[in-house]
Amino acid sequence: SGRCLILADGFFEPHTYVKPGTKTEKKQPYYITLPEQKLFYFAGLFNKLDEELYTVTILTLDANDTMAKIHNAKKRMPLILDEQFQENWIDPDLNENQIKELITVSFTNEALKYHPVSNAIYKRGVDTNTPDILKAVPAIDPEMDESRPTLF
């Protein structure tokens, strides 16, 4: 077992919307990337179960303002490592205090880009391994509608 890097170009997080005057929750997935869909690494942990089988988990932490707006029910976000900290994360010689410090300072400062996508990613039998799944759709939550006019 140990620490690892998990390569990605984007990820999905659910946004929860409750229409005013109701108690019915609706979830809408959002696709989140770095600018220009630049590749990045999540901070991960792995376990080797046998010679051919590993398990992996992505570390999460309290959401920043942007991610709290998107993942508004649990207010968590994955730890996206800034480039300067990627090698540090997999250094086997780090002690527990160094690891904790790294977790608090290593999140990327790049602005995250996001847009709502189809609920099809939640459906069984739908091929989600296609570029169409990443296309923007209208936001169900008016507060999240980037196209609506603002007063400021």
Where are these regions (language model features)?
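A structured binding-face within diverse protein domains that lines the active/interaction site
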Residues: 1-152
